[in-house]
Each structure stands twice: as structure tokens, then as C-alpha cells.
Amino acid sequence: MGINQWEQAEPGVKRKIHSPGNEVMMMEVVFEEGAEGSSHSHPHEQLTYCLEGKLAFQIDGKEVLLEQGQSVHIPSNAVHGVKALMPSRLLDVFTPLREDLLN
């Protein structure tokens, strides 16, 4: 996994981790229509901004629709997943650093 390089994350989903700071990092994620990010959780706090498209997030059992220009906060340890309702692109911001993605 390389910094500033696109990689396949899941079927229909690719991501690029941008160069991280000391305590915060960004990751761009592109979804084909119908592609899903499987449910997971992590101790990191996350902000997700929709650059384009429309997605349905499940965050701790609640559905949140996210469209271009909108953002959502995903608290630490919240179980979350997402499905793209159309081709979509997100910018995820994490703090502290996601060492699991960087190593």
C-alpha cells in the first residue's frame, strides 16, 4: 500500500491515502454505483465529505444519506458501512493516524 497511489480497496471501491500529518490524515475514496464499503469500526474519529455522488451510510444502525457538498461525523468505535447509490467520491479525514492503513 503506497501513499498518494490509488489501490483497490473492495470490489468497485478504490482509495488513495494522502500524505499524512502528525495527528491527522486524509483518504480519497471512489465508488462505482452499487459498490459497498463493508461494515467496520476503528478507534479513530472520522469526518467524511462527499465530493460527488450520493451514498447511504449505516452508522451504528442508523441510515444517513450523504450527497455532494455534505459531510458526516463518524464517532470513535462506531460501526459503519456505506453503499454508493450512484458513482461517488468521498474525502475521509481521520484522527489520530490510521496506522492500520499506513503500515
Give the location of each predicted region.
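A short, N-terminal "cap"/entry segment at the start of jelly-roll beta-barrel domains
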Residues: M1-E23, N103
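Histidine-centered metal-chelating micro-motifs
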Residues: E36-G37, A56, V72, S76-G81
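Glycine- and acidic-residue-biased ligand/ion/polar-headgroup-sensing regions
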Residues: H44-E45, Y49-L55, D60
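A cytosolic small-molecule/anion-sensing beta-strand core signal
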Residues: L51-E52, E67-Q68, M86
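Short acidic-glycine-tyrosine-enriched beta hairpin
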Residues: G61-S76
